Amino acid sequence: MLKGLTSKADARLKPALPGFTNVYRYWDARFAKVAVKLQPGECYVTKNDEMLVTVLGSCIAACIRDPVAGVGGMNHFMLPEQAAGHEITRNSLSNPELCYGNWAMEHLINSIIKCGGMRNRLEIKLFGGGRVLANMVRMDIGQRNIEFVESFLANDELPVIAKDLGGNYPRKILYFAATGQAKMKKMGIASDTNLVKQEKAYLDSLATKPSAGDVELF
C-alpha cells in the first residue's frame, strides 16, 4: 500500500507503467487522487488519472500529453545538456542522465510515443527556470535551461501551448495527466530551505566538476 492510502483508495490504485515504478506515489486527500512526487532527475509517464507534483527553482519541468492516446507525463531536469566530462553523480539522484535536458526531453517524449502517443498530437506545457539565488546573476542556470528547452522544442517543431518560465521565485506544479490541466503556485524562497540548498549544490557542482494551453494559479 502506498503511503497515505486508505484501503478504499488502494483498491482503485492502478499499477505504474513499466520503467516508472520507482517514482514515489502517495494519496492526496485534498484532490482525492494518487499523486506522484518527482525529484530532480526523475521522469514519470502514466495512462492513469494521477496528479504529478514537483517543486522547481532553476530546474525545468516539461508536462506533455497526447489527449487522444490518453497518456501523459512530466520530467524534471537540472541542467541543459550533458557534454563530455560533465556529470552529476550525487547518490540521491535516481537517474543522473535525466538531470540533463537533452536526455530528459528525449526520454519523456519517446516514452509517451511508446505508449501510443504521436508527436503531432503532443500538448506541451513548460515551467521553471527561475533565478532563486542572488549569485545566479553570474551563472544563470535557469535562463540556460529556458534557452535550451525552447530551442529543443523549436528544432523538433513541437509547439508549446502554455508556459511560465523565468522570474525570481520557485514554483510548485501540479499536473493532471488525464486532462492536461496544470496548476502553479509561486513560492517564497524561504518557504523551502531544501530548494535553496539544492540550488547552491547546482552551483557548487558546476564550479568544481570538469567540463564535459492555460495555467491555473492555486
Curated annotation (Swiss-Prot):
Among CDD domains, the record links this protein to:
CheD
Highest taxon of the source? Bacteria
For this UniProt record, the keywords arranged alphabetically read as follows:
Chemotaxis, Hydrolase
Matching entries from InterPro entries are given as:
CheD-like_sf, Chemorcpt_Glu_NH3ase_CheD, Cytotoxic_necrot_fac-like_cat
Q: Which GO terms describe its biological process?
A: chemotaxis
The enzyme class is hydrolase
**One Pfam match, by short name?**
CheD
* Reaction(s) the record says it catalyses: L-glutaminyl-[protein] + H2O = L-glutamyl-[protein] + NH4(+)
Q: What is its EC number?
A: 3.5.1.44
The UniProt record lists the keyword Hydrolase: yes
A GO molecular-function term, please?
protein-glutamine glutaminase activity
Chain's role: Probably deamidates glutamine residues to glutamate on methyl-accepting chemotaxis receptors (MCPs), playing an important role in chemotaxis.
Q: Which family does it belong to?
A: Belongs to the CheD family.
Spell out the PANTHER family in the cross-references: CHEMORECEPTOR GLUTAMINE DEAMIDASE CHED-RELATED (PTHR35147:SF2)
Q: What's the protein here called?
A: Probable chemoreceptor glutamine deamidase CheD
